């Protein structure tokens, strides 16, 4: 009887450990599967000096009256997910083509402000995520969140973009709550 009881206890203990490992593993891999969005902006007089920021952090400036002139965006952590974006440029309008996966959108050295942006996800996993983004626009401050290709900014109103925040979330998640609206300098 004692041997049977030890076998039962050993079996139950092994079962609990196995379930814990499986459950913890699946939760960890699910949490780790949310990709990282990384981006940098070219700022009037500052260039690319700010460097790359990620996951909703502010890129650019606020309260300094400096225009964004170009942006590069990429997604990391999911080989089946890409990102495309295009900007509305002072006196040029919307770019004809989307830039993608770290390519430059906007201008450098032309003293042209970005006025609006559209961002969308691509790839076989694009249907699993939403991309949210918002901009800090001249005279308006932080605007509301746009997502999945919607326009964020002031196309046609001749207002410069000064800052941007971008994040990728699981499909159907609500817009992020107010992220800190401070720059990353």
How would you label these PLM feature ranges?
Residues 19-34:
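Sec-dependent signal peptide cleavage junction
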Residues 1-12:
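Bacterial N-terminal signal peptides that target proteins for export
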Residues 32-185:
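Lectin-type carbohydrate-recognition ectodomains
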């Amino acid at each position: 009887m004692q041997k049977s009881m030890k076998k039962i206890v050993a079996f139950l203990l092994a079962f609990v450990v196995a379930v814990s490992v499986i459950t913890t593993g699946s939760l960890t891999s699910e949490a780790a599967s949310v990709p990282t969005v990384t981006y940098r902006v070219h700022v009037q007089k500052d260039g690319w000096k700010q460097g790359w920021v990620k996951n909703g952090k502010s890129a650019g400036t606020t309260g300094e009256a400096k225009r964004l002139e170009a942006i590069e965006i990429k997604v990391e952590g999911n080989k089946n997910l890409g990102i495309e974006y295009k900007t509305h440029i002072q006196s040029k309008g919307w770019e004809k083509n989307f830039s993608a996966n770290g390519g430059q959108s906007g201008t450098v050295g032309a003293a042209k402000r970005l006025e609006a942006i559209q961002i969308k996800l691509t790839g076989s996993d694009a249907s699993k995520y939403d991309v949210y983004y918002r901009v800090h626009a001249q005279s308006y401050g932080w605007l509301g969140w746009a997502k999945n290709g919607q326009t964020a900014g002031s196309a046609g109103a001749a207002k410069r973009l000064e800052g941007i925040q971008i994040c990728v979330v699981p499909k159907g998640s609500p817009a992020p709550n107010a992220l800190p609206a401070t720059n990353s300098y």
